Curated annotation (Swiss-Prot):
Gene name linked to the record: psd
Protein's name according to its UniProt entry: Phosphatidylserine decarboxylase proenzyme
Keyword Lipid metabolism applies: yes
TM helices/strands, residue ranges: none
Active site: S190 (schiff-base intermediate with substrate)
Keywords: Cell membrane, Decarboxylase, Lipid biosynthesis, Lipid metabolism, Lyase, Membrane, Phospholipid biosynthesis, Phospholipid metabolism, Pyruvate, Zymogen
Stretches assigned to coiled coil: none
Main location as per UniProt: membrane
């Protein structure tokens, strides 16, 4: 392996969604540098941050059909009973909600938490309040994805925040999806809520850091283990 290949392999790939922003940041840096040279370096720092933001690293995904895997990188900001948003069609009974807050330094690629079929995708316009606030799940712009798994229906909600103003979802209704599959992203700083059945054995607590596609949020069979993994 050449030195160039080694250097290339040591960095996470950049998702194609980021290229327009990276190019725009760099062009603006050049323009600012033409006006006053120190501004170029300020713009270059922002360009490097943009490259980092849109990184899309491979993950080691555990292949256990009884596990619910984190759909987002970030910090677990809420774990507890909550009535899911009405638009998801999951009923009025409480389910377990796990919220993952993604700051501007988190990888913002969202991944499928459990294998199944996409039953519905529901976009809901709204505000752009701080995504860390509990009320963001009710009032902020969001996009809900309902997955019909072998253990029942699970809701995943992408929530825009004060900085994030663009929710992207690549999945479509009736798609068959697998655990760890990329299904969307949110730009720039946001939150992701997941609504799961009450019988799930929780494996995370508030304040814990989660890794999309790897961290086990909960299990339908507390005794189950896995020896199979997928790199993606």
């Amino acid at each position: 392996m050449s030195i160039l290949q080694s250097v290339h392999n040591s960095f996470a790939p950049i998702h194609k969604e980021g290229y327009p922003f990276i190019i725009a940041f760099f062009v603006i840096s050049l323009i600012l540098g033409w006006v006053w040279s120190p501004l170029f370096w300020c713009g270059l720092v922002l360009t490097v941050w943009c490259i980092y933001f849109f990184r899309d690293p491979e993950r080691v995904i555990p292949l256990n059909p009884n596990w619910i895997i984190s759909p987002a990188d970030g910090r677990i900001s809420f774990v507890g009973p909550c009535i899911p948003p009405e638009e998801l069609g999951l009923g009025n009974a409480e389910m377990i909600r796990i919220s993952v807050f993604m700051d501007i330094f988190s990888c913002h690629i969202n991944r499928v938490p459990i294998s199944g079929k996409v039953e519905s995708i529901i976009y809901h316009p709204g505000q752009f309040a701080n995504a860390e606030l509990d009320k963001a799940s009710q009032f902020n712009e969001r996009n809900g994805v309902v997955i019909d798994s072998k253990h029942g229906k699970i809701g995943v909600v992408q929530i825009a925040g004060a900085i994030a103003r663009r929710i992207v979802c690549w999945s479509q209704e009736d798609d068959s999806v697998v655990t760890g599959q990329r299904f969307g992203l949110i730009r720039f700083g946001s939150r992701l809520d997941i609504y799961i059945p009450n019988e799930v054995k929780l494996r995370v607590t508030v304040g814990q850091t989660s890794i999309a596609g790897e961290t086990v949020l909960g299990s339908f069979d507390d005794k189950s283990a896995t020896t199979e993994f997928r790199f993606d």
